[in-house]
Amino acid sequence: MVSKTFILMAAIAYVEARFGQEQVPIAAIQAVQGGNPGEAATIAGAAISDLLGAASSCAKLTRADEIFTKLGGGADALAAAIGMVTAEKNTNPSANGNAQNVCGDASLPATPELRGITPLIDPAVDVDGKAAALSQSSATTPLQADGMSVFDLMSANGLGDLANAGASKGNNASNNNAAAGNNNAAGNDNAAA
C-alpha cells in the first residue's frame, strides 16, 4: 500500500513539475510595467490558455504580439513576449502520439522583434535537445524569417519531423509542408484528399 501511494505521489509531482515549466512566461508578463493599470495581469491570465495543448498553436504568437504592443513595447514587454514565443505548449503524452503543434502561419508573429524565434517542445519528443538549442539561440539571435512560419523555421533547421504545422483560427495552413518532403500533414488522417 505504501509503495502505491509513493508511486502516485511521484506521478503527481512529475505532472505538476512539467506543467510548471510550460507556465514560465506568465510571471514575466505580470511583471511588465507598461500598458494600462491591470492590463499586464489580464493578459497574463489569458495567456495561460494559449499554452494548453488543445489551444491553437498560433494563439500564443498572437498573444506575444499583444504583450509587446499593449504593454508599451519596452524591454520588459519584449522579454515577456519572447518568453511567450519560446514557451513550451502543454501536451498530453498519451494523446495523439504527443504531437507537438507549431504555428504554420507565416504572418505570425507580426511584431518584427519576435519573428525568427522558435519554441521549446516537449523534451520527451526533443530527445536530443536540438529544438531546445534552436529555441535558445533564436531567442537571442533570431533566424531570418521573411515569408516563413515558425514551423517553416523549424523544418528548415532539420526539426520538421518533430512537429506538426498548426493553423491559426480560420487559416488552412496550406504551406506545402507535405509537398516539401514533410509528411506531417500527409501522413495523418487529417490530410485533405
PLM-predicted stretches and their roles:
Residues 1-21:
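Fungal secretory targeting signals
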